[in-house]
Amino acid sequence: MLLLLRPETASIRTPTASRAAAAKLFLDGPYGARFAGEISASRQGYFSSRIEVLAHPEDPDFVQTIARQHAIGVTSGQRFLLASWRGVPVTAFAASFLDTSVAIFMLESSGLRRPADLVGKRVGYRRASEGDVVFDAMMAQLGLPRSQITKLPDRGSFEALEAGEVDAIIAAIDEQPDPSNPTFVKLNVIKPQDYGIHVPGLVYFASNDLIHDRPSLIADVLQGIIRGWQFAYRDYAQSVPVLAGSTGLPTERLKFELQQQRSLVLPTGGRIGDYDESRWRTLRDILLFAKLGEEDVPLARAVTYQFVRDVYRRSPDLAAPGAWSEEK
């Protein structure tokens, strides 16, 4: 089947790129550290089948695109679940970021440190973003008056924060400036996880027909991605040059972003790719609270845990302590 790709879609060049791909894995964003597992799996040959990994940023109908292309994708848990509720025929089968990467940043000099400090302040965010919903859920969980917070759309950049246009911003943890930068300004960070908000961050999903017709392919892709994440974090001296060749990021910036997201991919005592039902229930509840959709498709139909269980059962070495070590 010939795929009609958007102009900005680009694939990673691999030795098998000229051969017909068994499936395509689309990334909801540009190549970068947050897709290090997928990039590593492709570049290091961890996929048994020929899987083409493609960056597919800025597609407002990303989940629908995956369903239409009979493909595999990775996007935010929020974006996936809302599309599933709208009837897009897709199923999530594993986690990339086991928790949200959303954080709230303030200048250290402001003295703002806790969620309660944000009452009466200006908070910048990106319109229709995951961060906006997670922030509201955190404030509601803490019983803080959201009506007393001035939220400014499209002011969610670190430039806006440093310029004093806002008192805090909602952004992804891996987007923060590198402390080694000469112009770096010290920041305070609030993580929603520290206040009981745990939701799936990035998730892997596929069209329902691909999952039903080719389950062994999904299992192969998942195993390859797990090995890819292990490679990314086992030794930066090996992985960063490989990843830099695909992402175009400076090596130090790439290493910094990998460090920032490490706990989201490799949680203490957890397994790469694993997620639990409680995180999905929390995400469902906060989306309903935000009135962003109706649960027309129950979680039991939108999410499967079987692929993760099967992969680790068949290859227990993937979860062994020696499978990945502390970053070097």
Regions found by a protein language model. Give the residues of each.
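Short, low-complexity disordered leader/linker segments with a strong preference
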Residues: 1-22, 318-328
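Short, glycine-/small- and polar/acidic-enriched structural segments
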Residues: 13-152, 158-160, 167-173, 186-192, ...
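Short polybasic/polar patches that bind polyanions
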Residues: 42-43, 84, 140, 181, ...
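Short linear loop/turn motifs
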Residues: 52-55, 256-262, 297-309
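Pocket-lining segment of extracytoplasmic ligand-binding domains
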Residues: 78, 156-248
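Secondary-structure end/capping motifs
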Residues: 214-293
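Conserved C-terminal helix/tail region of periplasmic/extracytoplasmic solute-binding proteins
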Residues: 288-328
